[in-house]
Amino acid sequence: MTQGRLFYPLAVLQDRHFRSKYPNYNESRELKTWSVVSKRFPAWEQKLVSMLLDNKYAESIIFINSDVSMSSVGVFKRTKLLIRTHILNSHYKAVIDFESRLNTQPITSEPTELADFIECKLLLILNWFLRGEYHQCLQRFIQLIIDIPNLVELMVTLPKDDIFISNETMFYIITVSALVSIPLDNLDTFIHLEELEQFHKHFDVLAGKGKLIINSKFMKFFDWWHNDMERLCKQDYFLEKKWDIISKTMRQKMYAFYLRIATKIQISYLSERVGISREIVTQEITQLISEACLNFQIHDDLILYQKFDPQMALNDLMMTEDITLDNKLSQLRRQNHNLRVIVDEHLALRKSRIQRRSKASDEEPMNEEEVFALSENELCNETADTFND
């Protein structure tokens, strides 16, 4: 998918990942090219790349933030390198802190600085996607278009010699985020937002495939979704990370649509619509009904609407609460029993000690050595008793 050269550590990481997952994967051309190009890096970049290749992410962060050689690197480029490092380390939460910093940092119209700033913003969008927060991903992209009206045109002209995320990958991220997070009733309105006009001019997948959903052509949509789209996503390092959950979410969105308009529907019908086996559809619908607390039951091949019964719901709740209460009471009984045993043991120990002291007082007076010896023993016993309490 990538046209140009990948950021070298990412190319290596991507190569390692796909080699471990797909036995027939061949080393990427970008990786071979970069292994030669990297020798011409500045000294600081060679050092940083070396640390990233060794997965020394914490050291890389310290190096970017504090090494003297980084003082000549612009603020947005340093920020870009920091965000890249956190993403390579899958430390997505740390990236969120950069949003407020970028929003308060002034920028100039200098091309290199603007390019680094745009990539920082795109990396933040990528980060929301990798966190699985697709609606946030869309919101950030729309806001970025509002802030930079010619954003898509600028993205197309960004340098191609150090790519961390390609334009195509970013456009697909926006597309799948919209498809899974925008309600079906609002999808047509979203696609026709004025802010997205330039996006559609350069990338028409969202408009084209979204129209299939809007027109209820689900079989045609899922034929593309489970074939061309799946194949594409599984060849992309970032899209592949979220594809399984995204694909399942898209299907559950369709199930919810049908359950909303029907009181009885066949699993085999849904299986045909989404293009996967009945077994998988049954599992996913069962999960959807359970997690969303929907009033449906599955009987063989039929999904049937079950009218809400307050009495039955109350009985189920009381039964659940009774089980929970019984478990807690049983736990308290065990704790009380254990406490009673400990108290009885301590009482017996103290009684025995008192009896020994009483017996000793009736005997002949002790000399000085016996007194000190007994005192040491008593002290040890008292200390042990304190710890046992």
UniProtKB/Swiss-Prot annotation:
Keywords: Cytoplasm, Nucleus, Signalosome. Disulfide bonds: none annotated. The keyword Iron does not apply. Transmembrane segments: none annotated. It is found in: Cytoplasm; Nucleus. Its main location: cytoplasm. GO terms for cellular component: COP9 signalosome; cytoplasm; proteasome regulatory particle, lid subcomplex. Residues 143-312 form the PCI domain. Component of the COP9 signalosome (CSN) complex that acts as an regulator of the ubiquitin (Ubl) conjugation pathway by mediating the deneddylation of the cullin subunit of SCF-type E3 ubiquitin-protein ligase complexes The CSN complex is involved in the regulation of the mating pheromone response. PCI8 may also be involved in transcriptional and translational control. Component of a COP9 signalosome-like (CSN) complex. This is COP9 signalosome complex subunit 11. The gene is PCI8.
